[in-house]
A protein has these predicted regions:
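Phosphopantetheine-dependent thiolation modules in NRPS/PKS and related acyl-activating systems
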Residues: 1-19, 23-221
Length: 221
């Protein structure tokens, strides 16, 4: 087991994401509790202790997979018997009609898959261009304004990206399970505590932008 020390910026990203997690899962962590934590594992234990709901053995990710497979069959996107968790998403959603088919599945499921996402390189480039353009306002304002317009136009166009965020069905299911946990279980009064650490890890990895391998064994100090 490799222990990783999270840097100051990663810890700040976790703290920034925590408010959304608390709202999503309807819990509250006190500052006096979080200040004592030494690592991400203790953080997960604290979160789980806040759930007073009934714990049962329903495997939420498995249920999410079956719901996803049923949606594919119902919407006539692909023969559902031919897919498995390791199936490449490009096979399920080829470029032609990708956005339309994903929306059809989302409508059937009743929640967003968030399966499409621009590359981090694109986001970084647009952000860098925006910062550079703002700084340039003091020197060559006409060019700077043009750069700002390109940046905002680029950020707007990323909403229509056709790029798949995950590679396999398994990766997509892990993400959607974390983001729509109670909706997939169809109950807000129960959790599966044996799987919930994985859900917490996936959720914060996705929302704080920290790799799961680093976050799982991450130390705060």
């Amino acid at each position: 087991m490799k222990v990783n020390k999270l840097d100051r910026f990663e810890i700040e990203d976790l703290e920034d994401s925590l408010a959304l997690f608390e709202k999503t899962f309807n819990i509250k962590l006190e500052n006096t509790e979080t200040q004592k934590l030494k690592n991400f594992d203790e953080f997960c234990d604290l979160i789980i202790s806040k759930f007073k709901a009934e714990s049962n053995n329903l495997c939420t990710s498995q249920r999410a997979f079956y719901q996803f497979r049923k949606a594919l069959k119902t919407e006539n996107i692909i023969n559902s018997t031919s897919i498995s968790p390791n199936t490449d998403l490009k096979i399920i959603f080829p470029k032609k009609n990708r956005i339309r088919n994903i929306r059809k599945v989302e409508k059937h499921l009743g929640y967003k898959l968030e399966a499409l996402k621009p590359s981090q390189m694109t986001i970084n480039f647009l952000f860098f261009l925006l910062i550079l353009s703002i700084i340039s306002l003091f020197f060559v304002w006409k060019i700077a304004i043009f750069g700002i317009l390109i940046s905002f136009t680029g950020f707007y166009l990323t909403k229509f990206t056709n790029r798949l965020d995950k590679k396999t069905i398994r990766e997509l299911i892990e993400k959607t399970t974390a983001q729509n946990y109670f909706q997939i279980r169809n109950a807000e009064n129960s959790i599966n505590k044996s799987e919930f650490k994985t859900v917490i890890l996936e959720w914060f990895s996705e929302n704080a932008g920290i790799k799961k391998e680093k976050l799982k064994y991450g130390n705060f100090a």
